[in-house]
């Protein structure tokens, strides 16, 4: 259904161009931009479905590396901030970890996690001024990432299921937002493949907080250093 929606729109606007319905430069420009945007939607949907098929059958090639938490998230936030600014969405970022804190993670897939969570938040922002808060905390042997929005929130009855594939809270209301319905299930799988855990809290009309934890990297002392 979600793939068919942009295809139907592309066909409709293309037919409008061919039939001469778009009879002014402004209308033609609008139709062409809509076709382009819907084609991008299809591309994103296909990429998500392809990725999920790989993840679901454990065929995704993770490239784990030692990552400095502060440096990595600073780079991510800079990139995210530009995108949110273009959408007139406010961003606040707080990193409470030590400057030397490291994790073992796949940089590309962890970035996908962050982008998917924020992309999902953006879809459901309903306030005049959308806000995203990102906090990185030190919680014992783990780092905890919190991504908070001031969107419409999620009903308590729906909250336990938001990471299930193809699950949509109030699907009839949300159909206009688009998407594959598997973005958060991809996020959950990637975090679990990193040995972490993800969950959410939410209040309707106030907003949602997504949390995930990843174990910190700790040097294991070798036998020689112990004996010395």
Regions inferred by a protein language model and the residue ranges of each:
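Short alpha-helical segment of the dimerization/phosphotransfer core of two-component systems
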Residues: 37-42
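Conserved micro-motifs of the catalytic ATP-binding
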Residues: 57-62, 102-105
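A conserved beta-strand-to-alpha-helix junction within the catalytic ATP-binding
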Residues: 63-81
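Conserved catalytic submotifs in the C-terminal HATPase_c
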Residues: 63-66, 85, 90-101
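Short conserved segment of the HATPase_c
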Residues: 154-168
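Conserved glycine-rich
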Residues: 195-196
């Amino acid at each position: 259904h979600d793939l068919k929606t942009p295809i139907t729109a592309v066909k409709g606007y293309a037919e409008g161009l061919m039939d001469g319905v778009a009879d002014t430069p402004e209308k033609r420009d609008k139709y062409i931009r809509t076709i382009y945007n819907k084609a991008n939607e299809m591309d994103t949907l296909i990429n998500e479905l392809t990725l999920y098929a790989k993840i679901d059958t454990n065929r995704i090639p993770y490239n784990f590396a030692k990552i400095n938490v502060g440096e990595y998230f600073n780079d991510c936030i800079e990139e995210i901030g530009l995108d949110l600014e273009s959408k007139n969405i406010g961003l606040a970022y707080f990193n409470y970890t030590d400057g030397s804190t490291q994790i073992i993670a796949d940089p590309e897939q962890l970035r996908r996690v962050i982008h998917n969570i924020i992309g999902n938040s953006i879809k459901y922002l309903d306030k005049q001024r959308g806000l995203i808060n990102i906090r990185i905390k030190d919680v014992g042997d783990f780092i905890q990432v919190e991504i908070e929005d001031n969107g419409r929130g999620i009903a308590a009855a729906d909250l336990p299921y938001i990471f299930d594939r193809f699950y949509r809270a109030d699907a009839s209301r949300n159909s206009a937002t688009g998407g594959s319905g598997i973005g958060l299930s991809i996020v959950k799988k990637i975090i679990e493949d990193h040995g972490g855990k993800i969950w959410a809290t939410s209040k309707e009309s106030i907003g949602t907080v997504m949390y995930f934890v990843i174990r910190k990297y700790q040097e294991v002392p070798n036998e020689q250093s112990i004996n010395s």
